Every structure is written in C-alpha cells, then in structure tokens.
Regions:
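Conserved small/polar residues in nucleotide/adenosyl-binding loops
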Residues: 131-135
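N-terminal/domain-start alpha-helical segments
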Residues: 1-122
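Short, basic/polar amphipathic helix motif occurring as a linker/hinge flanking DNA-binding modules
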Residues: 121-130
C-alpha cells in the first residue's frame, strides 16, 4: 500500500484529501506540527508528498528543498497561489507537479496514480527501444 504525506495547514482540506485517498486504499498521513515536517517525513517514509505553499513557520518551497536533500520521491504542490511564478518556483525547487486550489479530487487522484505508477511500477523496466520501427 502506498503511503502519502499531506503537508497542508487547512484542516478541512487535509481531512478531505485524507478521506478521499483512503477510499482509494492509500495510507494517508497529515502533518500536524509544521515545525517538524522532516521528522514526520522520516517517520512515515511516504511514497509521495502533497505540499501546500503557504504554511506556518516555513513555506512549502523550503520543505520541498529539504525533502530533496534526502529523497527523489514525487512531490505534488497543491496551492491556491495560482500565478505562473509560484508554479515555476514549485517545479524549480524540486516539485514534480502543481495543482491549483480549488481542485477536483478525481483529478488529484489520477495525477497521484500516474506519478506513483511512473515512479515505482515502471522503475524496473528497461528504456524504450525503437529498433522495430521503420521510417
């Protein structure tokens, strides 16, 4: 079962995401102490992180950079900060995708599924071969 860490300070959004993803059989953990995101990350050992940008103490860009020091797992930013500069910063700081709030839970789910599939299920496959194709 895949583990997902939700770093979101809006309790309603965090609870909604957690309940929805649990219905898809994901193990979901929500950070409660925003001074201890890395401790929670080490404890949970997630396969994927959902990261808000505006957080107490340190923003999501900071935590993404800290996670990138120790892991290459997928990080999807989920934020209402929908201007292009925040999207560019999120990806440049190590994020893999960006979803703008408000969002459809089904869109979030398929993005998570695709990210997990590419990261973990296809990881053992050899690179694509084009030798059988003719021009």
């Amino acid at each position: 079962m895949y583990r997902i860490l939700v770093v979101e300070d809006d309790e309603v959004i965090a609870k909604t995401i957690r309940q929805h993803l649990q219905s898809w059989n994901y193990e979901v953990f929500a950070v409660a102490d925003f001074n201890s995101v890395m401790e929670e990350f080490a404890r949970v050992k997630p396969h994927l992180v959902l990261m808000d940008i505006r957080l107490p103490f340190h923003n999501g860009f900071y935590w993404c950079t800290e996670i990138r020091k120790v892991s290459k797992l997928p990080i999807i930013f989920v934020s209402s900060m929908n201007d292009n500069m925040n999207l560019v910063m999120a990806i440049n700081m190590g994020g893999d995708d960006f979803i703008i709030k408000p969002f459809d839970l089904n869109v979030l789910t398929v993005k998570i599924q695709a990210m997990l599939r590419r990261t973990y299920e296809f990881a053992g496959e050899s690179p694509v071969s084009y030798t059988h194709l003719r021009a």
